[in-house]
Amino acid sequence: MKRVHIMVLDSFGIGAAGDAEKFGDQGADTLGHIAQAFAEGKADKDGRKGPLHLPNLCRLGLGKAAEESTGKFPVGLDKDAEIIGAYGYASEISSGKDTPSGHWEIAGVPVLFDWGYFKDLKNSFPQELLDNIVKRANLPGYLGNCHASGTVILDELGEEHMKTGKPIFYTSADSVFQIACHEETFGLDKLYELCEIARDELNKGDYNIGRVIARPFIGDKPGNFSRTGNRHDLAVEPPAPTMLKKLVDEKQGHVVSIGKIADIYANVGITKKVKATGIDALFDATIEEMKLAGDNTIVFTNFVDFDSSYGHRRDVVGYGEALELFDRRLPELMELVKEDDILILTADHGCDPTWQGSDHTREHIPVLVYGPKVKPGSLGHRETFADIGQTVVKYFGLSPVEYGKAMF
């Protein structure tokens, strides 16, 4: 029975990529800088003291992969862990450092074109686009129209949005059009419909924007607003068949999306969708689906919280504590890896919580592979994330993806 379980620790970079300078990210190191902060005692408090504690990830080779990436073993991690998995690090060949680019490249389809971006910090969106959306959605107007942190803008405009019914439009350094609306006063279905209209207008206008993101929130006043787990991403479809689509088309296989995976691939090559919010809930759903998974199945989970709750918010301690939670629960996944199964732990980009600004960082990603038939040891430097996709299609006996070399 052939099954692959892929866990993406969203934004978990392990050192600046060779081309990081082009992105202003020379020296970024998500894991290394978190480990440094913990070793300096910045995470010490009642019930938690000392360096970053990731024993299970270290046994899978995380520390050694990071050392291969940066030339330096992350401070405080276990140098003497017995290695039970294959480990390496991968560079990205896609033009951006965003979520779709990273995930598509993992699946064998790098983004070699340039996404469109809304670069103006204020009045970010073209007036014609805004007018068309307002008219089609019958809106009283809009708020925002700027670059913003998704949590800060709620405190700034959330109350006005609730009073006026005007949605909050904003963007970032990524190729995104984001819409924040109150779940109760505006309504979730209405927000999703608005996002569909925005996606259609962006497509018609040839803006080449990667994602429209629904950002529902609750609360009644500044300081009290919080985003809910009902986020929804409307992505464009990958430009070529991914490993997911190939498994479904060529072997009538199954691909189970947990978290935001289905949104990232625009539902192409996905046969089952499971929603879950938060690291524990994502783990629970993954365990359940791994138990149910039959032959020719990929169980594919995105752990978004590392990125959205800690990376972008530059919360070093929160990020490290989330990694420790992930590590504590990892053995529950590992014990479900049977016979021919392969478990792959990786990331889609970096988001160094010690870095300036609030955006992603251009970094190498870890590639940690575990299974009864996987030979422990170094996989070295992988020249593209697509080596993961090529390895997966080879394992399932599918036609090759266009990019990447199989790792074994």
UniProtKB/Swiss-Prot annotation:
Instruction: Kindly state what the record says about how the cofactor is bound.
Output: Binds 2 manganese ions.
Q: Where in the cell is it found?
A: Cytoplasm
Q: Which domain of life is it from?
A: Bacteria
Could you tell me the EC number(s) of this protein? 5.4.2.7
Q: Which UniProt keywords apply?
A: Cytoplasm, Isomerase, Manganese, Metal-binding
Which chemical reaction does it catalyze?
2-deoxy-alpha-D-ribose 1-phosphate = 2-deoxy-D-ribose 5-phosphate; alpha-D-ribose 1-phosphate = D-ribose 5-phosphate
Q: Which InterPro entries does the entry mention?
A: Alkaline_phosphatase_core_sf, DeoB, Metalloenzyme, Phosphopentomutase_DeoB_cap_sf
Q: Which residues bind Mn(2+) 1?
A: D10, D348, H349
* MF terms in GO: magnesium ion binding; manganese ion binding; phosphopentomutase activity
Q: Which residues does Mn(2+) 2 bind? A: D307, H312, H360
User: Required co-factor?
Assistant: Mn(2+)
- Entry's Pfam families? Metalloenzyme (PF01676)
Note whether Cytoplasm occurs among the keywords.
yes
Q: What is its main location?
A: cytoplasm
Write out the pathway annotation from the protein's UniProt entry: Carbohydrate degradation; 2-deoxy-D-ribose 1-phosphate degradation; D-glyceraldehyde 3-phosphate and acetaldehyde from 2-deoxy-alpha-D-ribose 1-phosphate: step 1/2
GO cellular component terms, semicolon-separated: cytosol
Name its GO BP terms in alphabetical order. Answer: 2-deoxyribose 1-phosphate catabolic process; 5-phosphoribose 1-diphosphate biosynthetic process; metabolic compound salvage; nucleotide metabolic process
Q: Which family does it belong to?
A: Belongs to the phosphopentomutase family.
Q: What does this protein do?
A: Isomerase that catalyzes the conversion of deoxy-ribose 1-phosphate (dRib-1-P) and ribose 1-phosphate (Rib-1-P) to deoxy-ribose 5-phosphate (dRib-5-P) and ribose 5-phosphate (Rib-5-P), respectively.
Record NCBIfam families: deoB, PRK05362.1
**The protein's name:** Phosphopentomutase
